[in-house]
Amino acid sequence: VITVDASNVVAALIDSGYYTAEDFENLPETSAPSQDITGRVGIVLPTRDEPRWVQDETRFQEALAAAGYEVSILFSQGDSARERANVEDLITRGIEVLIITPHDGDAAAAAAAAAKAAGVTVISYDRLITNTDAVDYYVTFDSVAVGEAQAQYLVDKAEGTGNPLYLYAGAASDNNAFLFFEGAWNVLQPKIADGTFYIVNSSEAVALQDQAELSREQLAQIIGQITTNWDFNTAKNLAEANLTVATVEDKGDVFILAPNDGTARAIADAFGVDSDVTSYVVTGQDAEQASVQYIIDGKQSMTVFKDVRTLVNDAIKVAVAVLEGQTPETTGAYNNGAIDVPALQSEVITVDASNVVAALIDSGYYAAEDFTGLE
């Protein structure tokens, strides 16, 4: 718990992103000090409600403290208007570099443009801000490779032909959801074409199953039908609805493309209690602590480990290079609909029960005491 009074109300409740300054009148004059940021880096993350972003906050704080910088980290709580207000707040503090994970890639374009107009270098972090030339750099995991790793896991576990395949995706407002699904489709489509899998829960995907490459519009058609909106309850409700209309023949031993760990757990909970489901293989992403426990317990099959420490360090590397007047290292580029954004990409690792200790415990990412049932 934190004691809050007039002396720290701004730091505790506004700077943390819990509220915005616009929610109140007569805030103390300390609400936007332009000198408070050493290194002049501001960070805007999308929500505190997903463990992944709380992890990122912690890693940023630790890494920047170790590097001798202070940082202001604000959360937008899934609200593009609050996101814009957060960016404007940081601009008034005199930041020179903005690291931002957009809630909605298109909607964040206005915030990026405002930062750019103020002379701020904009680094899109993990999710790409779309349809604007105001993005300078993109720091990300190889999102297509994430989807390919998820799909390859399903392929490797499948035997014979005629295996039921259930498809789920992230939020249609998130460019990464398109990249994840694109990567998965790269691997799954040939195995759908040869009969290894058949699609159960998406008529849009069935209509396009003979196409090896999908346009953005075609991806949008599929994602619009199978979106979880990155939300646990939405994912569980959708999975339950799919199972309600599925035949017994569409159950048995099933294969499930789930886009991330939160949705994977939700979908696993739904499939796990259906008496007609004999077994399921379900993918995930982010190596959230709860999903690691699910993997240990045999309730989630795998996760794609995206070491936040690496991504945070890459973002800081780009930010520091900018602050020191250097050109940051990049390894590729992503088209955001307006320009090709120079990108620094981090590697991903497939984790399941066979390597969970080596990948996540021995690496120091988690402690063995965080889990039960480890061998």
Language-model-derived ranges and their functions:
Residues 1-375:
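A residue-level marker of the well-folded mature domains of exported/periplasmic proteins
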